[in-house]
Amino acid sequence: MEAVQQALHGLDVGSTEAVRILSWANSEIPAIYDRDQTAYLVLGSYRDPYFRRVRAVSDRLNRRYGTYAFLIGDLSDIDLPRLPEFRVKFHITATLSDYVAAVFEQDAGGEINELGKLGETEYFEKAYIFPRAYQWETEDHLSDEHDVIAAAAQLMATTDIDDETKTAELDALVDRADQAGIDISVDEVTTKLEEHGFEVPSYSWVHLNDFRLFELHGRCYPWTTEEELLEATDDLPGSPRPGWEQ
């Protein structure tokens, strides 16, 4: 019940609620906790059209030997009218899963709250994120001028910071580009942004910071097409796909 206490921040759980949680756990947990297979909790939006790609990641992982990939939505309900049931299910399953894979395509929706949970809890060490059209921001991943322009476009599309902050962050981005050996000025970046339209998802500044944290830890996999998303999924640790599928 430690995961339940973490989910509820020490809130007292009634006897009936405890019985229901334990009954649910006895039904759902064995497949997750099976030590002979690798368990992946897959997170993402349940809204169309995003859900289809989240399900595609789960299906791709389940092609591997000895793998159980699942969504919280695949699991039965616990019937906890008083308690935040999703939090309970999230913390129990995230605790028991070997890895957590999270797909992001927008700056709104429940999956964004999950990003915060992953970044601030012990689940961080087992988590891998897949943000759509995220542009690398650290100097290790800036290889040419186009990378800098794309990262700047992403910065300018950020939804929750003022122009002064954007200007300061653009200066910092150009400094990182310079450290990576890319000769480009702030004025040149601004001009190119005005001349060329770059369509990027409008992530918030908080989310971009979380993405950057995962990027620095080598567990961020940007993608633009579903094919790229599935190819990135193959890079997750765990059992490989069958040889005949390679």
Regions found by a protein language model. Give the residues of each.
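Conserved catalytic or regulatory cores that recognize and/or transform ribose-phosphate-containing ligands
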Residues: 1-246
